[in-house]
Protein backbone atom coordinates (compact mmCIF):
# COMPACT_ATOMS: atom_id res chain seq x y z
CA UNK A 1 0.00 0.00 0.00
CA UNK A 2 1.40 3.41 -0.90
CA UNK A 3 2.18 5.67 2.05
CA UNK A 4 -0.75 8.02 1.42
CA UNK A 5 -3.36 5.53 0.09
CA UNK A 6 -6.62 5.17 2.01
CA UNK A 7 -6.89 1.99 4.07
CA UNK A 8 -10.08 -0.07 4.17
CA UNK A 9 -11.15 -0.46 7.80
CA UNK A 10 -12.82 -3.66 8.97
CA UNK A 11 -16.25 -3.66 10.60
CA UNK A 12 -18.06 -6.27 12.69
CA UNK A 13 -16.54 -9.50 13.97
CA UNK A 14 -14.79 -9.78 17.32
CA UNK A 15 -11.26 -9.52 18.72
CA UNK A 16 -9.64 -12.61 20.24
CA UNK A 17 -6.15 -13.58 21.32
CA UNK A 18 -2.97 -12.23 22.89
CA UNK A 19 -1.02 -9.16 21.82
CA UNK A 20 2.25 -7.51 22.85
CA UNK A 21 2.23 -3.75 22.34
CA UNK A 22 5.47 -1.91 21.47
CA UNK A 23 7.78 -0.54 24.14
CA UNK A 24 6.73 2.52 26.12
CA UNK A 25 7.54 5.69 24.17
CA UNK A 26 8.33 7.81 27.26
CA UNK A 27 10.73 5.24 28.72
CA UNK A 28 12.34 4.62 25.30
CA UNK A 29 13.27 8.31 24.87
CA UNK A 30 14.62 8.58 28.41
CA UNK A 31 16.71 5.42 28.26
CA UNK A 32 18.51 6.77 25.17
CA UNK A 33 19.06 10.24 26.70
CA UNK A 34 20.25 9.05 30.12
CA UNK A 35 22.40 6.33 28.55
CA UNK A 36 24.07 8.98 26.35
CA UNK A 37 25.27 11.08 29.32
CA UNK A 38 26.22 8.12 31.52
CA UNK A 39 29.68 6.57 31.81
CA UNK A 40 29.91 3.17 30.13
CA UNK A 41 27.41 1.10 28.16
CA UNK A 42 23.64 1.07 28.53
CA UNK A 43 21.69 -1.84 27.02
CA UNK A 44 18.00 -1.35 26.24
CA UNK A 45 15.64 -4.26 25.70
CA UNK A 46 12.19 -3.62 24.20
CA UNK A 47 12.95 -0.08 22.96
CA UNK A 48 10.12 1.27 20.78
CA UNK A 49 11.35 0.94 17.16
CA UNK A 50 9.30 3.91 15.93
CA UNK A 51 9.91 7.32 14.42
CA UNK A 52 10.04 9.39 17.63
CA UNK A 53 12.75 7.44 19.53
CA UNK A 54 14.64 7.10 16.23
CA UNK A 55 14.68 10.94 16.08
CA UNK A 56 16.10 11.09 19.62
CA UNK A 57 18.81 8.56 18.71
CA UNK A 58 19.72 10.48 15.53
CA UNK A 59 20.17 13.73 17.50
CA UNK A 60 22.40 11.98 20.05
CA UNK A 61 24.50 10.32 17.33
CA UNK A 62 25.06 13.76 15.78
CA UNK A 63 26.69 14.77 19.10
CA UNK A 64 29.10 11.83 19.19
CA UNK A 65 27.08 9.18 21.04
CA UNK A 66 27.41 5.61 19.73
CA UNK A 67 23.98 3.97 19.44
CA UNK A 68 23.34 0.69 17.61
CA UNK A 69 20.52 0.58 14.99
CA UNK A 70 16.98 0.61 16.41
CA UNK A 71 15.16 -2.40 14.96
CA UNK A 72 12.18 -4.44 16.15
CA UNK A 73 13.22 -7.22 18.52
CA UNK A 74 16.86 -6.07 18.74
CA UNK A 75 18.62 -5.00 21.93
CA UNK A 76 19.95 -1.44 21.55
CA UNK A 77 23.28 -0.42 23.11
CA UNK A 78 24.28 3.15 23.93
CA UNK A 79 27.95 4.02 24.48
CA UNK A 80 27.75 6.87 26.98
CA UNK A 81 30.00 9.92 26.63
CA UNK A 82 29.59 11.08 30.24
CA UNK A 83 27.85 14.14 31.61
CA UNK A 84 29.97 16.67 29.71
CA UNK A 85 30.94 14.62 26.66
CA UNK A 86 28.33 15.75 24.12
CA UNK A 87 30.02 17.37 21.10
CA UNK A 88 28.82 20.44 19.25
CA UNK A 89 27.03 19.04 16.16
CA UNK A 90 28.00 20.11 12.65
CA UNK A 91 24.39 20.24 11.48
CA UNK A 92 20.91 21.16 12.71
CA UNK A 93 19.48 18.54 15.09
CA UNK A 94 16.33 17.19 13.40
CA UNK A 95 13.66 16.16 15.93
CA UNK A 96 11.25 14.97 13.22
CA UNK A 97 7.68 14.89 14.56
CA UNK A 98 8.74 14.35 18.18
CA UNK A 99 7.80 16.98 20.75
CA UNK A 100 9.42 14.85 23.46
CA UNK A 101 12.74 14.85 21.59
CA UNK A 102 12.75 18.63 21.18
CA UNK A 103 11.66 19.47 24.73
CA UNK A 104 14.05 17.05 26.42
CA UNK A 105 16.92 18.15 24.15
CA UNK A 106 16.40 21.75 25.31
CA UNK A 107 17.07 20.64 28.90
CA UNK A 108 19.93 18.35 27.92
CA UNK A 109 21.76 21.03 25.90
CA UNK A 110 21.08 24.25 27.84
CA UNK A 111 23.99 23.70 30.26
CA UNK A 112 26.64 22.76 27.66
CA UNK A 113 28.68 25.94 28.19
CA UNK A 114 30.38 27.29 25.06
CA UNK A 115 28.57 24.94 22.65
CA UNK A 116 25.88 25.93 20.15
CA UNK A 117 22.92 23.81 19.00
CA UNK A 118 19.99 24.34 16.63
CA UNK A 119 16.86 22.17 16.95
CA UNK A 120 14.26 21.83 14.19
CA UNK A 121 11.49 19.43 13.16
CA UNK A 122 8.69 18.83 10.69
CA UNK A 123 5.82 21.23 9.94
CA UNK A 124 3.68 19.85 12.78
CA UNK A 125 6.49 20.16 15.36
CA UNK A 126 7.18 23.74 14.26
CA UNK A 127 3.66 24.63 15.44
CA UNK A 128 4.01 23.12 18.93
CA UNK A 129 4.68 25.38 21.96
CA UNK A 130 8.21 25.25 23.39
CA UNK A 131 8.21 28.29 25.69
CA UNK A 132 6.77 26.10 28.48
CA UNK A 133 10.26 24.50 28.56
CA UNK A 134 12.33 27.52 27.51
CA UNK A 135 10.87 29.81 30.19
CA UNK A 136 11.68 27.65 33.25
CA UNK A 137 15.12 26.93 31.74
CA UNK A 138 15.67 30.69 31.33
CA UNK A 139 15.16 31.08 35.10
CA UNK A 140 18.26 28.84 35.44
CA UNK A 141 20.21 31.06 33.02
CA UNK A 142 19.55 29.17 29.77
CA UNK A 143 19.79 30.97 26.42
CA UNK A 144 17.08 29.55 24.09
CA UNK A 145 15.89 31.59 21.10
CA UNK A 146 13.39 30.95 18.35
CA UNK A 147 10.35 32.21 16.48
CA UNK A 148 7.47 33.80 18.41
CA UNK A 149 9.84 34.97 21.14
CA UNK A 150 11.40 31.56 21.70
CA UNK A 151 8.13 29.60 21.52
CA UNK A 152 8.41 27.96 18.09
CA UNK A 153 11.12 25.97 16.30
CA UNK A 154 13.65 26.28 14.81
CA UNK A 155 15.26 26.93 18.20
CA UNK A 156 18.86 27.97 18.87
CA UNK A 157 20.44 26.92 22.18
CA UNK A 158 23.62 28.66 23.28
CA UNK A 159 25.04 26.52 26.08
CA UNK A 160 25.70 28.45 29.30
CA UNK A 161 26.60 27.71 32.92
CA UNK A 162 23.25 27.11 34.62
CA UNK A 163 22.45 28.05 38.20
CA UNK A 164 20.56 25.77 40.56
CA UNK A 165 17.24 27.24 41.61
CA UNK A 166 13.61 26.47 42.50
CA UNK A 167 11.49 26.16 39.36
CA UNK A 168 7.69 26.04 39.26
CA UNK A 169 6.38 24.42 36.08
CA UNK A 170 3.43 26.16 34.37
CA UNK A 171 1.69 22.85 33.55
CA UNK A 172 1.86 19.32 34.97
CA UNK A 173 3.98 18.02 32.11
CA UNK A 174 6.53 15.22 32.33
CA UNK A 175 8.33 16.71 29.33
CA UNK A 176 8.78 20.09 31.03
CA UNK A 177 9.81 18.46 34.32
CA UNK A 178 12.26 16.09 32.61
CA UNK A 179 13.88 18.92 30.64
CA UNK A 180 14.53 20.81 33.90
CA UNK A 181 15.89 17.66 35.60
CA UNK A 182 18.30 17.09 32.69
CA UNK A 183 19.44 20.72 32.92
CA UNK A 184 19.80 20.40 36.70
CA UNK A 185 22.42 17.65 36.29
CA UNK A 186 24.88 20.26 34.95
CA UNK A 187 23.84 23.28 37.10
CA UNK A 188 26.15 24.92 39.65
CA UNK A 189 23.95 23.99 42.63
CA UNK A 190 20.81 22.09 43.67
CA UNK A 191 17.58 22.52 41.68
CA UNK A 192 14.02 21.79 42.83
CA UNK A 193 11.12 21.39 40.40
CA UNK A 194 7.62 22.01 41.77
CA UNK A 195 4.68 20.76 39.66
CA UNK A 196 1.04 21.91 39.99
CA UNK A 197 0.10 18.21 40.11
CA UNK A 198 2.14 15.04 39.64
CA UNK A 199 2.94 14.01 36.06
CA UNK A 200 4.41 10.68 34.90
CA UNK A 201 7.54 9.89 36.91
CA UNK A 202 9.63 7.73 34.53
CA UNK A 203 12.49 10.27 34.59
CA UNK A 204 12.74 10.29 38.39
CA UNK A 205 12.76 6.49 38.59
CA UNK A 206 15.31 6.08 35.81
CA UNK A 207 17.66 8.92 36.84
CA UNK A 208 17.87 7.39 40.32
CA UNK A 209 18.68 3.99 38.79
CA UNK A 210 21.48 5.62 36.73
CA UNK A 211 22.94 7.14 39.92
CA UNK A 212 21.65 10.72 39.98
CA UNK A 213 21.35 12.42 43.38
CA UNK A 214 17.58 12.93 43.18
CA UNK A 215 14.93 13.17 45.89
CA UNK A 216 11.15 13.25 45.58
CA UNK A 217 9.08 14.93 48.30
CA UNK A 218 6.21 17.30 48.93
CA UNK A 219 2.52 16.51 48.62
CA UNK A 220 1.88 13.72 46.05
CA UNK A 221 5.56 13.73 44.97
CA UNK A 222 5.30 17.17 43.36
CA UNK A 223 8.71 18.44 44.59
CA UNK A 224 11.71 16.88 42.83
CA UNK A 225 15.21 17.95 43.86
CA UNK A 226 18.49 17.23 42.06
CA UNK A 227 21.99 17.86 43.40
CA UNK A 228 24.54 18.07 40.57
CA UNK A 229 27.90 16.31 40.58
CA UNK A 230 26.88 12.64 40.67
CA UNK A 231 28.29 10.43 37.91
CA UNK A 232 25.66 8.50 35.96
CA UNK A 233 26.56 4.88 35.15
CA UNK A 234 25.30 2.81 32.22
CA UNK A 235 22.41 0.48 33.08
CA UNK A 236 20.41 -2.42 31.70
CA UNK A 237 16.96 -1.05 30.86
CA UNK A 238 13.93 -3.25 30.13
CA UNK A 239 11.19 -1.18 28.47
CA UNK A 240 7.66 -2.40 29.28
CA UNK A 241 4.79 -2.28 26.77
CA UNK A 242 3.23 1.18 26.38
CA UNK A 243 -0.10 1.50 28.21
CA UNK A 244 -1.02 4.29 25.77
CA UNK A 245 -0.82 1.71 22.95
CA UNK A 246 -2.55 -0.95 25.07
CA UNK A 247 -5.45 1.51 25.53
CA UNK A 248 -6.70 0.86 21.97
CA UNK A 249 -7.06 -2.87 22.71
CA UNK A 250 -8.55 -2.26 26.17
CA UNK A 251 -11.33 -0.13 24.66
CA UNK A 252 -11.79 -2.39 21.62
CA UNK A 253 -12.01 -5.51 23.79
CA UNK A 254 -14.58 -3.86 26.06
CA UNK A 255 -16.68 -2.52 23.15
CA UNK A 256 -16.73 -5.23 20.48
CA UNK A 257 -19.22 -8.06 21.21
CA UNK A 258 -17.62 -11.48 21.76
CA UNK A 259 -14.12 -10.07 22.35
CA UNK A 260 -11.58 -11.53 24.80
CA UNK A 261 -8.06 -10.04 24.61
CA UNK A 262 -4.92 -10.34 26.72
CA UNK A 263 -2.35 -7.55 26.34
CA UNK A 264 1.02 -8.79 27.60
CA UNK A 265 3.80 -7.02 29.52
CA UNK A 266 2.15 -3.60 29.92
CA UNK A 267 3.76 -0.89 32.06
CA UNK A 268 1.46 -0.11 35.00
CA UNK A 269 3.26 2.90 36.47
CA UNK A 270 0.65 4.58 38.73
CA UNK A 271 1.30 7.95 37.03
CA UNK A 272 0.01 6.37 33.77
CA UNK A 273 -2.99 4.23 34.78
CA UNK A 274 -5.76 6.84 34.51
CA UNK A 275 -7.17 4.84 31.58
CA UNK A 276 -7.76 1.86 33.89
CA UNK A 277 -9.55 4.08 36.42
CA UNK A 278 -11.90 5.52 33.78
CA UNK A 279 -12.62 2.08 32.28
CA UNK A 280 -13.37 0.85 35.82
CA UNK A 281 -15.79 3.80 36.25
CA UNK A 282 -17.46 2.61 33.00
CA UNK A 283 -17.85 -0.95 34.32
CA UNK A 284 -15.38 -2.52 31.88
CA UNK A 285 -14.39 -6.15 32.49
CA UNK A 286 -10.59 -5.81 32.92
CA UNK A 287 -8.29 -7.98 35.01
CA UNK A 288 -4.60 -7.42 35.84
CA UNK A 289 -2.86 -10.80 35.50
CA UNK A 290 0.58 -11.62 36.95
CA UNK A 291 1.52 -8.14 38.27
CA UNK A 292 5.30 -7.85 38.67
CA UNK A 293 8.18 -5.39 38.90
CA UNK A 294 10.63 -5.15 35.97
CA UNK A 295 13.67 -2.84 36.15
CA UNK A 296 11.97 -0.49 38.63
CA UNK A 297 8.65 -0.22 36.77
CA UNK A 298 5.43 -2.09 37.69
CA UNK A 299 4.28 -4.37 34.85
CA UNK A 300 1.38 -6.77 34.26
CA UNK A 301 -0.75 -8.50 31.65
CA UNK A 302 -4.22 -7.02 31.06
CA UNK A 303 -7.20 -9.22 30.12
CA UNK A 304 -10.30 -7.49 28.79
CA UNK A 305 -13.66 -9.01 27.81
CA UNK A 306 -16.66 -7.42 26.16
CA UNK A 307 -19.43 -6.12 28.40
CA UNK A 308 -21.87 -3.21 28.75
CA UNK A 309 -20.28 0.20 29.40
CA UNK A 310 -21.65 3.20 31.31
CA UNK A 311 -20.96 6.86 30.43
CA UNK A 312 -18.13 8.60 32.29
CA UNK A 313 -16.81 11.97 33.28
CA UNK A 314 -13.32 13.07 34.17
CA UNK A 315 -11.38 16.30 34.35
CA UNK A 316 -8.17 18.12 35.12
CA UNK A 317 -7.19 16.12 38.21
CA UNK A 318 -6.69 12.85 36.27
CA UNK A 319 -5.54 14.39 32.96
CA UNK A 320 -1.74 14.05 33.49
CA UNK A 321 -2.30 10.29 33.94
CA UNK A 322 -4.30 9.72 30.73
CA UNK A 323 -3.66 12.66 28.41
CA UNK A 324 -2.75 10.37 25.47
CA UNK A 325 -5.82 8.16 25.98
CA UNK A 326 -8.45 10.88 25.50
CA UNK A 327 -8.93 10.11 21.76
CA UNK A 328 -9.75 6.43 22.30
CA UNK A 329 -11.93 7.24 25.34
CA UNK A 330 -13.92 9.65 23.14
CA UNK A 331 -14.60 6.65 20.86
CA UNK A 332 -15.71 4.55 23.86
CA UNK A 333 -18.13 7.32 24.91
CA UNK A 334 -19.97 7.07 21.58
CA UNK A 335 -21.12 3.55 22.53
CA UNK A 336 -22.28 4.29 26.11
CA UNK A 337 -25.99 5.11 26.51
CA UNK A 338 -26.02 8.62 27.97
CA UNK A 339 -23.78 11.64 28.26
CA UNK A 340 -20.01 11.49 28.85
CA UNK A 341 -17.98 14.58 29.64
CA UNK A 342 -14.23 15.21 29.25
CA UNK A 343 -12.82 18.45 30.69
CA UNK A 344 -9.41 19.85 31.65
CA UNK A 345 -7.98 18.61 28.34
CA UNK A 346 -6.86 21.87 26.67
CA UNK A 347 -3.34 20.35 26.42
CA UNK A 348 -4.71 18.18 23.58
CA UNK A 349 -5.09 21.24 21.39
CA UNK A 350 -1.28 21.53 21.10
CA UNK A 351 -0.40 17.88 20.41
CA UNK A 352 0.62 16.61 16.93
CA UNK A 353 -2.76 18.01 15.90
CA UNK A 354 -5.57 19.73 17.81
CA UNK A 355 -6.72 16.32 19.00
CA UNK A 356 -10.03 17.52 20.47
CA UNK A 357 -11.05 19.18 17.19
CA UNK A 358 -9.84 16.29 15.03
CA UNK A 359 -11.59 13.57 17.07
CA UNK A 360 -14.83 15.60 17.18
CA UNK A 361 -14.66 16.16 13.41
CA UNK A 362 -13.96 12.51 12.53
CA UNK A 363 -16.53 11.01 14.93
CA UNK A 364 -19.21 13.50 13.81
CA UNK A 365 -18.58 12.32 10.23
CA UNK A 366 -19.70 8.87 11.45
CA UNK A 367 -22.86 10.33 13.02
CA UNK A 368 -21.72 10.86 16.62
CA UNK A 369 -23.32 13.63 18.69
CA UNK A 370 -20.44 15.66 20.15
CA UNK A 371 -20.22 19.15 21.55
CA UNK A 372 -16.70 20.56 21.69
CA UNK A 373 -15.56 22.83 24.54
CA UNK A 374 -12.37 24.83 24.88
CA UNK A 375 -10.95 22.24 27.31
CA UNK A 376 -12.81 19.08 26.30
CA UNK A 377 -16.02 17.64 24.87
CA UNK A 378 -19.47 16.33 25.75
CA UNK A 379 -20.44 13.13 23.93
CA UNK A 380 -24.03 11.87 23.82
CA UNK A 381 -23.56 8.17 23.25
CA UNK A 382 -25.82 5.37 22.11
CA UNK A 383 -26.45 6.59 18.54
CA UNK A 384 -25.36 4.09 15.87
CA UNK A 385 -22.24 5.13 13.96
CA UNK A 386 -22.06 4.63 10.20
CA UNK A 387 -19.00 3.81 8.15
CA UNK A 388 -17.59 6.67 6.09
CA UNK A 389 -14.39 8.19 4.67
CA UNK A 390 -12.13 9.10 7.63
CA UNK A 391 -8.76 10.85 7.92
CA UNK A 392 -6.09 10.56 10.65
CA UNK A 393 -5.08 14.16 9.82
CA UNK A 394 -1.48 12.83 10.34
CA UNK A 395 -2.04 11.98 14.04
CA UNK A 396 -1.06 8.48 15.19
CA UNK A 397 -3.52 8.30 18.09
CA UNK A 398 -6.38 9.50 15.88
CA UNK A 399 -5.55 6.84 13.25
CA UNK A 400 -5.77 3.99 15.76
CA UNK A 401 -8.83 5.43 17.54
CA UNK A 402 -10.77 5.64 14.27
CA UNK A 403 -9.84 2.05 13.40
CA UNK A 404 -11.54 0.93 16.64
CA UNK A 405 -14.58 3.18 15.99
CA UNK A 406 -14.92 1.65 12.50
CA UNK A 407 -15.13 -1.88 13.99
CA UNK A 408 -18.41 -0.83 15.65
CA UNK A 409 -19.90 1.08 12.70
CA UNK A 410 -22.57 -0.09 10.29
CA UNK A 411 -21.00 -0.29 6.85
CA UNK A 412 -17.38 -0.02 5.70
CA UNK A 413 -15.02 2.89 6.38
CA UNK A 414 -11.77 4.05 4.80
CA UNK A 415 -8.95 5.88 6.57
CA UNK A 416 -6.69 8.35 4.81
CA UNK A 417 -3.11 8.76 6.11
CA UNK A 418 -3.31 5.53 8.11
CA UNK A 419 0.51 5.30 8.09
CA UNK A 420 0.54 7.85 10.97
CA UNK A 421 0.05 4.92 13.39
CA UNK A 422 3.73 4.04 12.93
CA UNK A 423 4.79 7.04 15.08
CA UNK A 424 4.06 5.02 18.23
CA UNK A 425 2.83 1.59 17.06
CA UNK A 426 4.50 0.36 13.82
CA UNK A 427 2.76 -3.06 13.90
CA UNK A 428 -0.75 -1.81 14.77
CA UNK A 429 -2.40 -2.74 11.46
CA UNK A 430 -0.82 -6.21 11.46
CA UNK A 431 -1.94 -6.80 15.06
CA UNK A 432 -5.49 -5.63 14.26
CA UNK A 433 -5.73 -8.01 11.28
CA UNK A 434 -4.46 -10.93 13.39
CA UNK A 435 -6.78 -10.33 16.38
CA UNK A 436 -9.91 -9.63 14.30
CA UNK A 437 -12.08 -12.63 13.44
From Swiss-Prot:
Catalyzes the transfer of the enolpyruvyl moiety of phosphoenolpyruvate (PEP) to the 5-hydroxyl of shikimate-3-phosphate (S3P) to produce enolpyruvyl shikimate-3-phosphate and inorganic phosphate. Phosphoenolpyruvate binds at residues 25, 99, 128, 175, 355, 397. Its main location: cytoplasm. Signal peptide: none annotated. Belongs to the EPSP synthase family. It catalyses: 3-phosphoshikimate + phosphoenolpyruvate = 5-O-(1-carboxyvinyl)-3-phosphoshikimate + phosphate. It comes from the Bacteria. This is 3-phosphoshikimate 1-carboxyvinyltransferase. The lineage of its organism: Bacteria, Bacillati, Cyanobacteriota, Cyanophyceae, Synechococcales. Disulfide bonds: none annotated. InterPro entries: Enolpyruvate_Tfrase_dom, Enolpyruvate_Tfrase_sf, EPSP_synthase, EPSP_synthase_CS, RNA3'P_cycl/enolpyr_Trfase_a/b. PROSITE patterns: EPSP_SYNTHASE_1 (PS00104), EPSP_SYNTHASE_2 (PS00885). SUPFAM superfamilies: EPT/RTPC-like. Its EC number is 2.5.1.19. It is an enzyme of class 2 (transferase). It is found in: Cytoplasm. One of its GO terms (cellular component) is cytoplasm. 3-phosphoshikimate binds at residues 25-26, 30, 173, 175, 324, 351. The active site is at residue 324. GO terms for molecular function: 3-phosphoshikimate 1-carboxyvinyltransferase activity. Monomer. Pathway: Metabolic intermediate biosynthesis; chorismate biosynthesis; chorismate from D-erythrose 4-phosphate and phosphoenolpyruvate: step 6/7. Keywords: Amino-acid biosynthesis, Aromatic amino acid biosynthesis, Cytoplasm, Transferase. One of its GO terms (biological process) is aromatic amino acid family biosynthetic process.
